[in-house]
């Protein structure tokens, strides 16, 4: 995928897993309705909305920082790959809708409240933010969401996250692109 997209696609990304499943002709693909992250799935179970935060989405499929949505050129390329593998869905049909910080990501439904609290004390209606992973949380916690800011994480792995002022000029396989909760790379 990195070669087809001219953009580094780490093997851990959702789209890389889907691509490998297609290359391996895995049987479950015939009934595949959609793909999501754990955070996105839990959010859908609580709100009924299949949405995901832009930072979380950037670990599923490349994001265009100008639009804050999946990169249209790469979506078109992956649609061609899906067709080559006789998949019935398009990229956009498979992926959750992207939301930026502050976007309407739904409310806690009665069913969602019951999942969290079967006793009925928790009531539906709470506003829900777009689900994000730990990268976005770290960026916000360290106020590293503006251009030319960054942070270093030293936990299970050690890495730096830097908010760029412009797109990279070429593919660097050692750099994994992520997106801030506001949609910047």
Placement of each model-derived feature along the sequence:
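Gly/Ser/Thr-rich active-site cleft segment
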Residues: 2-132
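Catalytic phosphate/nucleotide-handling subdomain of diverse soluble enzymes
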Residues: 114-121, 126-185
């Amino acid at each position: 995928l990195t070669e087809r997209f001219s953009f580094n696609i780490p093997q851990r990304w959702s789209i890389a897993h889907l691509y490998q499943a297609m290359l391996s002709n895995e049987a479950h693909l015939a009934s595949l309705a959609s793909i999501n992250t754990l955070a996105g799935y839990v959010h859908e179970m609580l709100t009924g909305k299949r949405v995901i935060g832009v930072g979380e989405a950037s670990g599923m499929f490349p994001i265009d920082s100008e639009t804050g949505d999946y990169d249209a050129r790469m979506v078109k390329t992956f649609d061609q790959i899906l067709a080559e593998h006789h998949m019935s869905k398009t990229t956009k049909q498979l992926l959750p809708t992207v939301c930026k910080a502050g976007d309407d990501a739904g409310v806690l439904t009665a069913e969602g409240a019951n999942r969290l609290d079967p006793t009925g004390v928790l009531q539906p209606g709470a506003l829900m933010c777009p689900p994000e992973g730990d990268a976005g949380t770290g960026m916000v916690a360290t106020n590293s969401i503006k251009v030319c800011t960054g942070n270093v994480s030293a936990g299970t792995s050690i890495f730096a996250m830097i908010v760029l002022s412009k797109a990279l000029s070429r593919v660097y396989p050692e750099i994994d692109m992520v997106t801030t909760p506001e949609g910047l790379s």
